[in-house]
Amino acid sequence: MAKRTVITGGPGTGKTALVTELEKQGHYCYHEIIRQMTLQAKKEGNQAMVNPLAFVKDPLAFNRMLLQARIAQFEDASQLQVSSVFYDRGIPDVLAYMDYFEQGYDSEFTQPSQNLRYDAVLLLPPWEAIYQQDNERLESFDQACEIHDILESCYRQYGYEVVAIKPGTLKQRVNEVLDILAQAE
């Protein structure tokens, strides 16, 4: 079975660039669900979904959809014949964001975080030098820092050792990720 590694962190920390570079180097990667949802909606001409977070009428249903999509990624990886898999965000990210937005949830949301386990959780810290707001990233840098703290707390709450990836060039970060995983084997 593939070793499952989550790359997480607040908005604008370089997760997508890191996952994309790992993929270019031949590693199997699952990309951020919200980005996929946004791209699909744009393809279908659904302007209300260009920024899904801004148009959510039922936050619980939206988060349920995100959770199910992340569970599907997790389950899909079980079928792969590869040694490792990287995820741009994991199942507990859904809970962390619900905590950030002060949304309640029940065991429907907590059970997957307890039962579907990743082998490693790598956290990219806030990095003001690369942080930019855009059409998909609406949070301020201070909000990104708060989300980072909630993400770290949430993963630790579910028993994960969270390993921070230092700021650096994309090449340095890729090498650090691969070194950490090689040491864990």
Predicted regions and their residues:
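Glycine-rich phosphate-binding loop used to anchor ATP phosphates in small-molecule kinases
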Residues: 63-116
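C-terminal alpha-helix
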Residues: 176-184
